[in-house]
C-alpha cells in the first residue's frame, strides 16, 4: 500500500472533442492538495490534433480536481485541465472553457444549470448496442414504449454499468442527481446539476470520463452520437435545464416567457454549437422539434424549449432547452444560453430550485 504517493490523473479535451488522460505519481510529502498548487504539465499536441510536430508541447493547467474513485490504495485525484499553447496564455484548439469562464465570472443573473446526458452503450466486439443479438434486430428495439425507465432483464440492458457510474460519480463528489433507462434498448441517461455555469460543464466532462472508463472494463464503449442509427430510430440528446434568479422568484413565469422569446432570436446561433450531426436528430420526430423551426410550450416534448408543467403551475422555476445533442461541448452550450439571455437585464436577488426532469 503506497500511502506515501499521490496519483494525479490529468484529463483534457482534444481537438475532436474527445477525452484524453495520463497520470503522474508525486511524493505525498511534497504534494499540496489546494488546486492552485497542482503542478502544470504538458503533452504532445501533435498526437491530439492540437499542435504541429515542430512546436508540439501543449500546457495542461489544472482547473478542477475531484477524488479519483478508481484508486483506493492511495491518495488520488481526477484533474480536469484546460489546454494552452506556448507561454500558457493562448488557449489551445477546443479550449472552450476559456470563454465560458470569462462569462460566468461576470454572471449577474445567478444562472443555475442542469444537463441530462443521454448515451448508448455499445459492445466493443460486435459493434452493436449492448446485448443486441444482431444488427437486424426488429425495429421494436427502437420504437417500443417498453424501454423508457424499464425494469427486467428482457428489456433493460447495461444497468450494472449505470449503477457503477452513479456510485463512482458520488464517490468523486460530483453533483449527479439521477439516472434512468431511455427510450431505446441499451440507451441510458444521467443528470448533472443544478450547478453554476462553469461547474456544471466541468462535472459533465468528469462524469463522461468516469462512464467511459467503466465501459472499458466490460469491453464496451459509449456513444454520444446524436443519431447512432437511422432516421426512424431515437436519437440521444443533452437537454439543458437552466434558470436565472428572477425565473426562480415570485412570478418568475414572466421572465421564463421572456427567456423563451430571447432564445427564439438566437435560435440559429445556438444550433450552431448544439452538437455535430444534430440535424440528423432534430427532425420533428421522436420527441424533437425541427432544426429549422423554433417553438416552446408547456409540457411539450416536441418543442425546442419545454416549460415543465409543474413550473407553469408554480409560476416560477426553470426551462428545458431540448435542442442540444448528446455530443455537445457543454461550455459552448452554456455560453450560448447565457449570451442569449444576458443582453439587457441587471438582476440583484437570489432564490433556489432543486429539481428538474
Segments predicted by a language model, with ranges:
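Glycine-rich, acidic/polar active-site loops that bind/position phosphate-bearing ligands
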Residues: 1-357
Amino acid at each position: 500500500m503506497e500511502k506515501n504517493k499521490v496519483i494525479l490523473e490529468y484529463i483534457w479535451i482534444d481537438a475532436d472533442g474527445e477525452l484524453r488522460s495520463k497520470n503522474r505519481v508525486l511524493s505525498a510529502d511534497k504534494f499540496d492538495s489546494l488546486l492552485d498548487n497542482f503542478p502544470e504539465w504538458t503533452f504532445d499536441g501533435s498526437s491530439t490534433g492540437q499542435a504541429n510536430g515542430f512546436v508540439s508541447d501543449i500546457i495542461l493547467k489544472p482547473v478542477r480536481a475531484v477524488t479519483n474513485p478508481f484508486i483506493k490504495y492511495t491518495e488520488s485525484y481526477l484533474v480536469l485541465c484546460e489546454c494552452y499553447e506556448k507561454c500558457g496564455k493562448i488557449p489551445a484548439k477546443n479550449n472552450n472553457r476559456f470563454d465560458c469562464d470569462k462569462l460566468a465570472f461576470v454572471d449577474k443573473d445567478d444562472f443555475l444549470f442542469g444537463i441530462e446526458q443521454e448515451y448508448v452503450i455499445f459492445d466493443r466486439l460486435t459493434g452493436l448496442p449492448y446485448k443486441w443479438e444482431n444488427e437486424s434486430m426488429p425495429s421494436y428495439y427502437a420504437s417500443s414504449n417498453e424501454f423508457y425507465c424499464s425494469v427486467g432483464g428482457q428489456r433493460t440492458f447495461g444497468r450494472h454499468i449505470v449503477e457503477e457510474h452513479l456510485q463512482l460519480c458520488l464517490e468523486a463528489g460530483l453533483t449527479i442527481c439521477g439516472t434512468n433507462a431511455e427510450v431505446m434498448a441499451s440507451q441510458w441517461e444521467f443528470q448533472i446539476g443544478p450547478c453554476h455555469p462553469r461547474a456544471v460543464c466541468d462535472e459533465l466532462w468528469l462524469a463522461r470520463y468516469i462512464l467511459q472508463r467503466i465501459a472499458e472494463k466490460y469491453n464496451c464503449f459509449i456513444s454520444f452520437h446524436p443519431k447512432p442509427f437511422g432516421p426512424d430510430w431515437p436519437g440521444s440528446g443533452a437537454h439543458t435545464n437552466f434558470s436565472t434568479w428572477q425565473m426562480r422568484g415570485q412570478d418568475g413565469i414572466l421572465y421564463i416567457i421572456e427567456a423563451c422569446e430571447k432564445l427564439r432570436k438566437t435560435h440559429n446561433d445556438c444550433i450552431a454549437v448544439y452538437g455535430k450531426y444534430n440535424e440528423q436528430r432534430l427532425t420533428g420526430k421522436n420527441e424533437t422539434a425541427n432544426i429549422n423551426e423554433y417553438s416552446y410550450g408547456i409540457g411539450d416534448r416536441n418543442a425546442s424549449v419545454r416549460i415543465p408543467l409543474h413550473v407553469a403551475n408554480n409560476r416560477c422555476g426553470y426551462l428545458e432547452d431540448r435542442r442540444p445533442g448528446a455530443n455537445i461541448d457543454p461550455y459552448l452550450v452554456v455560453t450560448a444560453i447565457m449570451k442569449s439571455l444576458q443582453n439587457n437585464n441587471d438582476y440583484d436577488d437570489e432564490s433556489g430550485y432543486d429539481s428538474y426532469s
